[in-house]
Design a protein with these regions (language model features):
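Hydrophobic membrane-insertion alpha-helices, especially the h-region
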Residues: 9-20
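Beta-propeller blade termini and top-face loops
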Residues: 19-20, 25-915
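Ser/Thr- (and often Asn-) enriched beta-sheet segments in non-cytosolic proteins
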Residues: 192-194, 294-296, 353-355, 557-559, ...
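Glycine-rich, phosphate-binding/catalytic loops in enzymes
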Residues: 514, 917-920, 977
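Low-complexity, Pro/Thr/Ser/Gly/Ala-rich linker/spacer regions in secreted
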Residues: 914-928
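C-terminal outer-membrane/trafficking sorting elements
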Residues: 924-936, 940-1015
């Protein structure tokens, strides 16, 4: 039994049975079921995320992400005392997901406990586990916006955390755009942290020392010594000292090289006895065999060691079984093979000579071939690269990881090119199946071994553990809440869908024992998403580079909706913005549905005064005014429930079946009525190539027809929103333009909706132009949906520097030019240039504004005159990419006024602060606890619906009895939301012909109605 919302055409619609279809090569419609597990095989492209970060974070004047901007903002946050939200009820509750992790570049098993470890995400902070990673707790003493790159624990127990990674920083080749803040230390097992003196970048630029610290290592011999590989060299540091012990590697004292080491230290490994070091600096490799006192450059042009003298980046590993055995894996740094494996090498004589053990991986190869950094479209060894030696007395083995992990074994005295064994898969099991024991999330960045010989891997999906040297894996992400969301959507019950970086489109259905559990619906990067507020089984989502998917059953099956552009092309925008408009009662609709009832329609009444004449005569039948009839919608798979306002007359021929009786048989009804289809729904998707709209988002008996409504897009689309009445579509661009497309309520045909057509009815106007991407658009819904378009529109603007990050126009729907969006971002001067990514105007009091920024959420209760920080409750200072509020009436949803926040690093949050304060009382005043019980259609032939009004959210019981009192069927539903026209469907196909009574109970209240079953 399902509870559905009805749409009356004042209006109610119920969904008929539906299925998924696509068009095959012959143009025929065919069923297309795609299991979730197949979508999980789709890989991500890391450069796409970089592209998007640059579009919304870059300095509005230079077009680049500037390190100085980030530093000045972070310093201001620490030094300036911010006003807190005046109403302390603005508290945020984490919704998770608590079973999905985020990008992890550092894992540290702690020495004081065999089951304690710390893991660090590039956004979201540090987390600690005391049960081997089974569950995690946030270390609140560490700033969540710092990029964690490496962790180490000294022999004296001190824990160090390095920040900033060369694979994340803005080096001009495309990265996430953030550099580090230096080196931090904790002397209390991670409870509190402080910046180590002289280890903060100053000035805060990419070339400043400590801008990136890719790797730190504890000295195995000296319990007070830490080795640091930064962007400008390799250092030794004594715990507690105020200055560096400058290592000889940073000077010119290298035995066979006079060129100073000023390139970023990419990787370091130290033997367990502390004597052998191997260091990668830029494209040079150095080895020390005396505890780091002296180094030798081993891959110079005339070294003849067998190593290449140039490469893009590299990882190193010293055997955990034999210090003389070491490994090096390299990545191509430029050209068509950029990001592919350049070669993997092994040495068995302490690094004197090296042998190739894996050649350059096949460029453009298939996923089944050995290509550890290839994701099916591009290679990204520059981004994800891991190499580790397996501690094993019985075999000498290594694991090389990137997109997937591969194992290699040394089987002879002289290493050579031998087979590599793939040890994990990047796709999960299918729905309802147990987790795959070999699943590890793609994009593998780091590894760590604990004292029990367990291997941990840090990935874009969090932490994984193997207890058998990579043979099988366990996901360790419970409460490791570090997911990076791009966009979110919700349904009337508060269930949430969100698009994430490299973690799919995630669905939180709030069911089961863990309401923070999320299910992945499609693989790769999930970006834009929407959910119907009237048919919540319908959900829309997109994948990186433009592909749009849809589900009609809340994620049980997901199918391709439409390819509006060449799908998956690297030239497409990384993200796809989308906007769904739903109006259940559009008085301006020009869509009319033909209606001709069957002669046995239960709604027809035959005039009693018609004289029965010989066969062939015509009689008049009518549907009386006030009747509620059901009609199939035009080109959308739902049923209109229409209340007849005046009698509708139809005409029918009849014949006598027996000349001596009045038994009649009627032929088809002759006339057709045309009924206005007031419920109207539109779905828009925006790309650089153009903006597309369909009026058939719920069509499944074929492919929804999309129209190109605008092809003048100046740049990437970064935001979209409809006006409440659906007459205007607002489109924001990376270039800083805001465009209004108008007259959708006058455009109903293909010609009227297709740009370039002679009958094109839409009007395009640029209504704002400025610096910084338009990251969000919010329209004032406080005036309802059918009283003309709301003139009041707010926008948020991304990018560091500049001003006016939140702007409002009071005439956005009618203005004919630019200049009406006024700056309402009245924050302390230090924060005027903070990027804003999202904005909400409260449905009940539009002077209440919430802004999602680079560092959390801000609140204004006076239309932007003043602002205060609103990171209360469980919210922290992380980027908030999406803020959305439930705008539907409180009697139709259970989450009216609730605001949801999608963060890029700490998952999803919600606040009930703006929940309509009198919603329950209002409902109770207007609607009895239980009222207006109806069965339709009545008589019933097979399926039917029971409609009722419910004054409060409650558990309900439904009983169906035969006329003689026998119980035929019983149903129970928990926590049915308050509202009018609640609906329960039932199937009477197996009922005998006759009369029945339906009884509905809510606590001590009950109501009943009769219905008849016929055939």
């Amino acid at each position: 039994m399902k509870i559905k919302s009805l749409l009356l055409t004042l209006g109610l619609v119920s969904i008929a049975g539906i299925g998924w279809y696509v068009v095959n090569d012959e143009g025929q419609e065919t069923a297309a079921y795609v299991p979730r597990s197949d979508y999980n095989k789709v890989e991500t492209g890391a450069l796409g995320a970089v592209e998007y970060y640059e579009s919304i974070k870059a300095n509005v004047y230079t077009g680049q992400i500037e390190s100085e901007d980030i530093l000045s903002m972070q310093k201001a946050l620490k030094k300036v005392k911010l006003p807190q939200a005046k109403n302390e009820d603005i508290t945020w509750e984490s919704m998770g997901p608590n079973n999905v992790g985020g990008r992890t570049r550092a894992i540290l098993p702690l020495s004081d406990s065999p089951n304690s470890l710390i893991a660090g995400a590039v956004s979201g902070g540090l987390f600690k586990s005391t049960n081997g990673g089974v569950s995690w707790n946030l270390l609140e003493g560490f700033d969540p916006y710092l990029i964690v790159s490496s962790l180490a624990q000294l022999g004296n127990g001190a824990i160090y955390c390095a920040t900033g990674h060369s694979r994340e920083s803005p080096d001009g080749n495309g990265r996430s755009g953030f550099i580090g803040r230096g080196l931090y230390v904790s002397n209390d097992d991670g409870v509190s942290w402080e910046l180590v003196s002289d280890f903060e970048p100053e000035p805060y630029t990419l070339n400043s020392n400590w801008a990136n610290i890719d790797v730190i290592k504890a000295d195995p011999v000296n319990p007070d010594k830490l080795w640091i590989g930064s962007n400008l060299g390799f250092y030794g540091y004594i715990h507690g000292s105020e200055s560096l012990e400058e290592n000889k590697l940073f000077t010119l004292n290298i035995s066979n090289d006079t060129v100073p080491v000023t390139n970023n230290i990419k990787d370091v490994d130290i033997s367990q006895d502390g004597q052998t070091f191997i260091v990668v600096s830029g494209a040079r490799v150095f080895i020390s065999d005396d505890g780091g006192e002296n180094f030798t450059h081993i891959n110079c042009d005339d070294c003849f060691s067998g190593l290449p003298s140039s490469f893009g980046t590299a990882e190193v590993a010293i055997s955990r079984n034999n210090n003389d055995i070491m490994y090096l894996s390299t990545v191509v740094g430029n050209g068509s093979a950029f990001g592919f494996l350049k070669g993997a090498y092994a040495s068995v004589n302490g690094g004197d000579t090296w042998s190739l053990i894996a050649p350059q991986s096949n460029v453009g190869g298939t996923l089944s071939q050995f290509a550890p950094f290839y994701n099916g479209a591009t290679a990204q060894g520059w981004y994800d690269h891991m190499l580790t030696s397996i501690p094993n007395d019985e075999a000498e083995e290594i694991i090389l990881g990137g997109i997937r992990m591969w194992r290699w074994e040394l089987t002879s005295a002289t290493p050579g090119i031998t087979a590599w064994e793939e040890v994990n898969a990047n796709f999960t099991s299918g729905p309802g199946q147990p987790p795959s024991p070999i699943y590890v999330h793609s994009d593998i960045h780091t590894d760590a071994w604990d004292s029990q010989g367990r291997l941990y891997a840090g990935t874009d999906g969090g932490v994984y553990r193997s207890e058998n040297n990579g043979g099988t894996w366990t996901e360790l992400v419970q409460d490791y809440i570090t997911t990076q969301f791009y966009a979110i959507a919700f349904n009337p019950q508060g269930q949430v869908l969100g698009g994430t970086q490299d973690n799919s489109s995630l669905w939180l259905n709030l069911e089961g024992s863990n309401p923070k559990f999320a299910t992945a619906l499609i693989g790769g990067d999930g970006v834009g998403c929407e959910i119907s507020q009237y048919f919540p089984d319908y959900m829309f989502m997109s994948q990186q580079r433009g592909t749009i998917y849809r589900t009609t059953d809340r994620g049980e099956t997901v199918t391709l909706m439409q390819d509006l552009i060449v799908p998956g092309s690297e030239s497409n925008d990384f993200t796809t913005d989308m906007a769904l408009h739903e109006n259940p009662n559009n008085e301006q609709s020009e869509i009319f549905v033909e209606y001709s009832p069957a002669v046995d329609s239960p709604w027809l009444v035959y005039y009693e005064n018609d004289t029965i004449t010989p066969a062939g005569d015509t009689i008049i039948a009518r549907i009386p005014a006030g009747s509620e009839i059901q009609i199939d919608a035009d080109n959308n798979d739902y049923v209109l429930s229409y209340t007849v306002e005046e009698d509708i007359n139809f005409y029918s021929y009849f014949q006598r079946l027996d000349p001596d009786s009045n038994i009649l048989e009627f032929s088809d009804i002759a006339d057709t009525a045309f009924i206005q289809e007031k419920p109207q729904f539109m779905f828009a998707a925006g790309y650089s190539q153009g903006t597309f709209v369909t009026r058939q988002p719920y069509k499944t008996n074929g492919v929804p027809q999309f129209f190109l409504v605008d092809n003048q897009n100046p740049s990437q689309v970064t935001s979209m929103e409809w006006s409440p009445d659906g007459d205007h579509l607002y489109i924001g661009y990376r270039s800083g333009q805001l465009v209004r497309l108008s007259n959708f309520n006058d455009a109903w045909t293909e010609e009227e909706l297709t740009v370039g057509s002679a009958d094109f009815a839409l009007e395009r106007r640029v209504i704002h132009s400025g610096s910084g991407a338009i990251t969000d658009i919010e329209v004032d819904y406080s005036q309802g949906r059918n009283e003309g378009a709301s003139e009041r529109v707010a926008i948020s603007i991304g990018g560091y520097q500049g001003s006016g990050k939140i702007r409002i126009s009071e005439v956005a729907a009618s203005v004919e030019g630019i200049g009406t969006f006024e700056d309402v971002w009245n924050v302390p001067s230090e924060f005027i240039g903070m990027p804003a990514y999202s904005v909400v105007m409260d449905i009940d009091n539009p002077e209440i504004l919430l802004a999602g920024t680079e560092y959390g959420i801000w609140y204004s209760g006076d239309n932007g005159e003043t602002w205060s920080e609103a990171n209360n409750g469980e919210m922290v200072r992380v980027p908030v990419f999406d803020l959305r509020q439930q705008k539907r009436e409180p009697w139709n949803v259970s989450n009216n006024g609730v605001v949801y926040a999608g963060t890029h690093g700490r998952g999803i949050y919600k606040t009930n602060y703006l929940l309509t304060p009198t919603s329950v009382e209002d409902i109770t005043d207007e609607v009895p606890v239980l009222n207006e019980l109806k069965v339709f259609p009545n008589p019933v032939t097979s399926r039917a619906s029971i409609s009722f009004d419910l004054g409060t959210t409650a558990d309900i019981e439904l009983y169906i009895y035969s006329i003689d009192g026998r119980l035929i069927e019983a149903f129970q539903e928990q926590r049915v939301g308050a509202g009018v026209d609640r609906q329960i469907d039932f199937d009477a196909s197996d009922y005998s012909i006759g009369q029945y009574i339906v009884q509905l109970r809510v606590g001590d209240d009950w109501n009943s109605a009769k219905f008849v079953v016929t055939r």
